[in-house]
Amino acid sequence: DIADYMGQIKAQASSLCLTKGICLQLETGANLGTLKADKLLLERAIMNVISNALDHSPPQGTIYVTVQKTDCFLHISITDEGGGFTPEALHHAQEQFFMGDKSRTSNMHFGMGLYITSSIIKQHGGQLVLSNSKKTGGAQVIIKIPY
């Protein structure tokens, strides 16, 4: 069940959020049913995006995760309240080794997160859509997977 699966991911991510004082809100649509996917790979993709959102969220900020089905796709939208994507990042963030934030060139960041996420989603026949949220001004990443 997709709602239960996303609840488990929220529980895992919430402990990371608590250490940074960030609230994680999960909203799932009704009657989502089940999804045929590699659950571990999909979890890694979702956690990569949530981790990025955590890194770019302001203190006491909120990360919004919404899950809904439209047409033949499941949409998992992850939106933060940070500064959003630069125009350059919108075009290149899914490329290997791209780092939009040059201050993050530490041993912990290699510019692989969204590249790996995009690769996982493509393996599932899906698409990763990057934009800036009109609601929060922050980054919005939508994972679209065929249902």
What are these regions (language model features)?
Residues D1-A11, Q25:
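A conserved beta-strand-to-alpha-helix junction within the catalytic ATP-binding
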Residues L18, C23-G33:
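Conserved catalytic submotifs in the C-terminal HATPase_c
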Residues A53-L54:
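Short helix-loop "hinge" at the ATP-lid/N-box region of the Bergerat-fold HATPase_c
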Residues Q60-C72:
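Short beta-strand/loop element within the Bergerat-fold HATPase_c
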Residues D80:
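Acidic ATP/Mg2+-coordinating residue in the GHKL
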Residues F85-M99:
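Short conserved segment of the HATPase_c
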Residues G125-Q127:
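Conserved glycine-rich
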